[in-house]
């Protein structure tokens, strides 16, 4: 039971990333078919609010980032957008340092792993963005000439990259704010419901402004648009916010965001199969470097959880009866 409890945060985050990957594939499909990104955001949060509200009421008695990410993905490919979005853990880590949710001791191996992992992640992003390389002829694609016809020119790629990057920063700020809020408002179900409700209201305002004079965008039929709205609302907004909040309370925002590469891997495979999206060597190498960097961060965070810094370390040191014992315990803890 203790082992299962320890592994539960990892299992939940892996399953959540698989769920996110399905949403990204469906979202890319409906965007290619002309669905408004603003209307999609409204419906998604509306569904999530309806689903979460009864549970929050019984048990308990971030729209800007999503719009920018979806808009960026519209100008590029699903794989590229997800891979670029993997800077999220690095950005979250930097913001967590600023807001004192994370600590770094340069003589500590675990702190060095987090710093090196963050730098490695940024390096992987640069490789993926600047280096294209030859096309990879995967056995399930039609060959090197197969390409996604949406957003393949250089100007669209740059525009998409900028939008996704801004969206990434916005979502990192949201994660930090959620972590701070959970310290004083520990009801995860209620918080997730409020996030979805406020997201719906904000999304309606943005959609009415951006889609002014175009009421047809609100029409939804029995097609992939309805499937995308329902799936993303229940799995990615309702469950996503709730599970993220539960795990974040014990492991922190950096741990939650560090699992994004799993979503990228699933999206890359599914996109190449479903959309016949071309894979390039440069992006594959960059994605590999990103994964290495991010899991260095995960390792460092795991050690943080195993050997917490403050206030547990201070309490442990206070229990030492002699200065020699204090020095010995401090040396052991800080060397990990």
UniProtKB/Swiss-Prot annotation:
It holds the Pfam family EamA. It is found in: Membrane. The keyword Protein biosynthesis does not apply. Residues 63-126, 169-298 form the EamA domain. SUPFAM superfamilies: Multidrug resistance efflux transporter EmrE. Keywords: Membrane, Repeat, Transmembrane, Transmembrane helix. The chain crosses the membrane at residues 7-27, 45-65, 79-99, 115-135, 160-180, 189-209, 227-247, 255-275, 279-299. One of its GO terms (cellular component) is membrane. One of its GO terms (molecular function) is transmembrane transporter activity. It is a multi-pass membrane protein. Signal peptide: none annotated. Disulfide bonds: none annotated. Belongs to the drug/metabolite transporter (DMT) superfamily. Plant drug/metabolite exporter (P-DME) (TC 2.A.7.4) family. PANTHER family: WAT1-RELATED PROTEIN. This is WAT1-related protein At2g37450. It comes from Arabidopsis thaliana (Mouse-ear cress).
């Amino acid at each position: 039971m203790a082992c299962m409890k320890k592994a539960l945060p990892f299992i939940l985050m892996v399953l959540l990333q698989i769920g996110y990957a399905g949403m990204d594939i469906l979202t890319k499909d409906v965007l290619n078919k002309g669905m408004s990104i603003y209307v999609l955001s409204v419906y998604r949060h509306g569904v999530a609010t309806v689903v979460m509200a009864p549970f929050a009421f019984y048990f308990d008695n971030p729209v800007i980032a999503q719009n920018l990410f979806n808009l960026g993905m519209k100008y590029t490919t699903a794989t590229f957008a997800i891979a670029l979005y993997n800077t999220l853990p690095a950005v979250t880590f930097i913001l967590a340092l600023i807001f004192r949710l994370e600590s770094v001791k340069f003589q500590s191996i675990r702190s060095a792993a987090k710093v090196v992992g963050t730098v490695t992640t940024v390096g992987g992003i640069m490789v993926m963005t600047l280096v294209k390389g030859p096309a990879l002829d995967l056995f399930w694609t039609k060959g090197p000439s197969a390409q996604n016809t949406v957003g393949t020119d250089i100007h669209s790629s740059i525009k998409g990259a900028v939008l996704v990057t801004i969206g990434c920063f916005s979502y990192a700020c949201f994660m930090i704010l959620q972590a701070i809020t959970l310290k004083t408002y520990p009801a995860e179900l209620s918080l997730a419901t409020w996030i979805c409700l406020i997201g719906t209201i904000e999304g309606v305002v943005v959609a009415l402004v951006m889609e002014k004079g175009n009421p047809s965008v609100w029409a939804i039929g029995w097609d992939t648009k309805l499937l995308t709205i329902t799936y993303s609302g229940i799995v990615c907004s309702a469950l996503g916010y709730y599970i993220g909040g539960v795990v974040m309370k014990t492991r922190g925002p950096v741990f939650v965001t560090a699992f994004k590469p799993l979503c990228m891997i699933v999206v890359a495979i599914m996109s190449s199969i479903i959309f016949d999206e071309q894979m390039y060597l440069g992006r594959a190498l960059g994605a590999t470097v990103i994964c290495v960097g991010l899991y260095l961060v995960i390792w460092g965070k795991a050690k943080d959880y195993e050997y917490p810094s403050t206030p547990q370390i201070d309490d442990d040191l206070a229990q030492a009866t002699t200065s020699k014992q204090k020095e010995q315990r401090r040396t052991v803890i800080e060397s990990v």
